[in-house]
Amino acid sequence: MRGSFQSILGVQVKICVCVKQVPDSWAEKKLSAGDSTLDRASADRVVNELDEYAVEEALRIIEAGEGEVTILSMGPDEAADSVRKAISMGAHAGIHISDPALHGSDALATSLVLAKAIEGRGFDLIIFGSESTDARMSVVPAMVAARLGLPQMTFANKVELSGGNLTIHRVTDYGYDEVQSSLPAVVSVVEKTNEPRYPSFKNIMAAKKAPMETLSLADIGLDASTVGLANAWSQVNDFAERAAKAKGTIITDDGNGAEKIEEFLVTQKFI
């Protein structure tokens, strides 16, 4: 079993796992012609892969002791499906932040929304996947930690929780770092942390009835002027379609194949 952890024995641990709904990483991604944002309807929507590792790590922690796991996601109405999918792995409840004004929000706005949704809920540990497959910026966990004034422990491939203290190992080019912190704290995990479980049929059915809050910006005390494409500090100004691949040259060997190959290599200036 990869990854390891220990629980705070005898203490209820409240864990929040932030997940993102993204286009399937194997599908061709497209940008919207109107505002140059990612066209999320152009491919199947799935739970961000690394976020599944975050959910798994949270579940392993509470299974070694006591606690509850809440899934938090920000996104359009369809993102509720990804919250339910994460709950079906074994989490207890979900929070979905959905508002039309969120369209086009950048990492700064995303971190603001997530932090406001987390505030005041008494979470001991907030876990993220280290990056999302649609943006790959790897900055939202650190931004959320900064907004909440909490320690951040990023890119963890091993998580240990014991006696109210958190220890993570982070692989580096020269070995690994061992970082310690008190709780509450924010952690982001990489794919080497564990192996995400498949939801059982029982948990899939239970996820349909699990409590889930659907909140607007107003519900978490934010104004639309703080989020969205118009207020984003990072935007795509222009883009171009990838050039189509040219058809390859087919050489038929009629007894002089070697000469044809040599001639082709000469014309391409390879020799």
Regions found by a protein language model. Give the residues of each.
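N-terminal glycine-rich FAD/FM-binding segment characteristic of electron-transfer flavoproteins
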Residues: R2-I271
